[in-house]
């Protein structure tokens, strides 16, 4: 008997075991992220922490109470989240549980692009000045804090209303984080580039400035000409057309590829043939 091969197989089995558990936990977190179940999980973790501490310090009464809470709590979870559990099982049966999160993110990204395009085209035609910065991997919390926090679901109507002249939020930048308008009337750093045309105003200088220190995508609508400009990576792209803007936003902001058929759907398709 070759014990070396057995030990290698045992080692590989352990790796696969860990990867499968990690994958399942990751998918569960992705499924419940942004739902009320997240708050419930936080509460469960707190109870578990209290139980461990009470056991360590010998607090028998507290430990007994936490044991009862955990024992009956899981039953309560099944009852409270029965609709969510049913939907999750139905999703598993349809074979798209592993693509649900990616599809949702992709829809949000396309909604973001559509909202930016509609609002900028509307404002450009009416020469309403605007400055919209979309945060990506580099954190922009310092700049968000300089403005008025909104944390509002993004829409073209809301973006337009923010930049209507003589309204409290029109002066400054809108910063988008994720699929939300994080803040309005935020201050962005101005670029010191000597190559920036002097005919460009503060909005363009701020758009270029933020692109020099973050990986954000920033869109500017000129109130003088109605032209739409875009900055990224320390570069300024002036007077971009509607088609050019769409191509750039699609390339830079959509990170999820088109949904592919899952193993389950392939299996079902093969069985039906």
UniProtKB/Swiss-Prot annotation:
InterPro entries xref list: C-di-AMP_synthase, CdaA, CdaA_N, DisA, DNA_integrity_DisA_N_sf, DNA_integrity_scan_DisA_N
Domain DAC: 82-242
Source domain of life: Bacteria
GO cellular component: plasma membrane
Effect on the protein upon substituting residue 172 to A: No c-di-AMP formation (construct without residues 1-80)
Cystine bridges: none
TM regions (residue ranges): 12-32, 37-57, 61-81
E.C. number: 2.7.7.85
Annotated catalysed reactions: 2 ATP = 3',3'-c-di-AMP + 2 diphosphate
GO MF, one example: ATP binding
Alphabetized SUPFAM superfamilies for the sequence: YojJ-like
Places the protein is found: Cell membrane
Alphabetical GO biological process terms: cAMP biosynthetic process
The entry's keywords: ATP-binding, Cell membrane, Membrane, Nucleotide-binding, Nucleotidyltransferase, Transferase, Transmembrane, Transmembrane helix
Reported consequences of knocking out the gene: Essential, it cannot be deleted.
Membrane topology summary: Multi-pass membrane protein
Subunit structure: Homodimer, required for active site formation.
Function of the protein: Catalyzes the condensation of 2 ATP molecules into cyclic di-AMP (c-di-AMP). c-di-AMP is a signaling compound secreted into the host's cytosol where it triggers the cytosolic surveillance pathway (CSP), a host pathway of innate immunity characterized by expression of beta interferon (IFN-beta) and coregulated genes. Expression of truncated proteins (missing first 80 or 100 residues) in E.coli leads to c-di-AMP synthesis.
Annotated family: Belongs to the adenylate cyclase family. DacA/CdaA subfamily.
Name of this protein: Diadenylate cyclase
């Amino acid at each position: 008997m070759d014990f070396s091969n057995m030990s290698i197989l045992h080692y590989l089995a352990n790796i696969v075991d860990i990867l499968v558990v990690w994958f399942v936990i990751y998918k569960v977190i992705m499924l419940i992220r942004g739902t009320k179940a997240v708050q419930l999980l936080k509460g469960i973790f707190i109870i578990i922490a209290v139980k461990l501490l009470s056991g360590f310090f010998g607090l028998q009464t507290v430990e007994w109470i936490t044991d009862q809470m955990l024992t009956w709590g899981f039953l309560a979870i099944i009852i409270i989240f029965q609709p969510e559990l049913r939907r999750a099982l139905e999703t598993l049966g349809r074979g798209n549980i592993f693509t649900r999160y990616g599809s949702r993110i992709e829809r949000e990204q396309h909604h973001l692009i559509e909202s930016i395009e509609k609002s900028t085209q509307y404002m450009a035609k009416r020469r309403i000045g605007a400055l919209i910065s979309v945060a990506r991997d580099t954190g922009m919390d310092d700049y968000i804090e300089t403005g008025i926090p909104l944390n509002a679901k993004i829409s073209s109507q809301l973006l337009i209303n923010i930049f209507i002249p003589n309204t409290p939020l029109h002066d400054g930048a809108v910063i988008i984080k994720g699929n939300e308008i994080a803040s309005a009337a935020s201050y962005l750093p101005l670029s010191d580039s000597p190559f920036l045309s002097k005919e460009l105003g503060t909005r363009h200088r701020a758009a270029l400035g933020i692109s020099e220190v973050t990986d954000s995508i920033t869109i500017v609508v000129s109130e003088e000409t109605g032209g739409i400009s875009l900055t990224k990576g320390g570069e300024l792209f002036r007077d971009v057309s509607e088609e050019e803007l769409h191509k750039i936003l699609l390339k830079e902001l959509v990170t999820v590829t088109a949904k592919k058929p899952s193993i389950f759907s392939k299996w079902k398709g093969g069985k039906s043939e």
